[in-house]
Amino acid sequence: MQSLGCDVAALNTVQFSNHTGYRQFTGTRVSASEITDLYRGLKQSYLDDFDMMLSGYVPGAPALEAVGEIAKELKEKAQARGKPGSFFWVLDPVMGDNGSLYVAQDVVPVYKGLVQYADLILPNQFEAELLSEVKIVDMPSLTRAISVLHERYAIPHIIITSVSLPDAATTVSSTMPNSVPGSSAPTPTPQEEGQGQSQPPRTKTLSVVGSTMTSARQPRAFQISFPAIDCYFSGTGDMFSALMLVRMREAVYNTEGGLTERESWLSDDSVDALDLPLAKAAEKVLASMHEVLTKTAEGMKGRVQRAKGFVDEQLQREKAMTDGVNGCGHANGHETGQDGHVDKKPRLDSTQTTMTTTTNGNSDGDEDGEKTEERIKEEEERRRKQMEEAEKEEEVQARKRLHLMKSKAAELRLVRHLDSLRHPKVEFRARRIECS
């Protein structure tokens, strides 16, 4: 947001060392009282003259309620000044994905109570299902979920992200037709249907579906499809919501007719879905997203290899210091070959293979020998199990290290690609969805 000209007052809801996608992190969650206290400090210094607010991940219900109170207070202040369009709340209802919650269960009803105060919400497909209580399985159920959100909560603007439907299009083109009658499948041109005309390669796609309601709370829906990049990234949701805030404001201010003075920046009912500021903003946001993600993915393999080499060297140094391998014939009972390779096979000392015998004519020596053999076998079995456990643990740690290296390599390369944020080339256009 700062790179696009916004003065930002960041109020953290968590203090984590890194993105939770790393599967390990340190830090603390900010309490509701701390959030309230920080905002009180801003007000005391007259630093609460905000035009917009973006709220994202809030881990607990009390903290979420505190964030909601801040937003409601800012909206009430704008209303009291007689300038309802002077404050705009973008709410990303972060609750879960792919059918699973990653917040506490009591967070869901709090979001259901807050979305009615938001101007724009950015749920993913799973979160839209939670809020609308409509299972999204195809385009008709998706448009029904949008209608419910408009009608039940009076949410002015909605963008549903990461939409993937069974009947969705698998071919993406920047020249797709502008109308989608209840389905995301593109209509083929006569040339495409003609004899001998080659078809474009079929590519897995994702979509975002957006809508701005009319004065009667009816949807004006559109869809933007784009090719999915088969790669894991850290921070895409945060990037999308931040860009939507900036580009929505930009699109509204570029619209004539005093839209900036209207509550929730709602366009006239006569404005077509494809001409909505929301649609224009989403096109530009996805252009930036696709460029940055593509450039991040291009260098990811090399970054993983460099990180792996660095970690391997560090592990070798630590092992050399711990085991005393350098200049020693063996370490911790493991044989070291001429090439420096540590042989992890169990080594038995000569004393362990010595059998006791007697010459007094009885069988005590044989019995002692049998017991010794049993002890040797037990010791060998114990060491074998220890070695197997050590190897399994090493495999687990190796997979963990690889995930951490991939996660680091998957961090979005934002600073290196500022031009993609500021001046993206819009390639994927919105298409109208006819809602029944």
Annotate each language-model stretch with its function.
Residues S17-T26:
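N-terminal transmembrane-helix/juxtamembrane module of multi-pass inner/ER membrane proteins
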Residues A242-Y253, A287, E291:
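Short glycine/serine- and small hydrophobic-enriched flexible loop segments
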Residues F25-I160, P166-A169, S184, Q195, ...:
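Glycine-rich phosphate/dinucleotide-binding loop and adjoining beta-alpha-beta core of small-molecule
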Residues Q2-N18:
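N-terminal glycine-rich anion-binding loops that anchor highly charged ligand groups
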Residues S179, S183-S184, S350-T356:
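Intrinsically disordered, low-complexity serine/threonine-rich segments
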Residues F226-L245:
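Short glycine/threonine-rich catalytic loop with a Thr-x-Gly-x-Asp
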Residues L259-T354, N360-S436:
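Charged C-terminal helix
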Residues Y102-A221, P227-C231, M248-A282:
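Conserved phosphate/ATP/ADP-binding segment of small-molecule kinases
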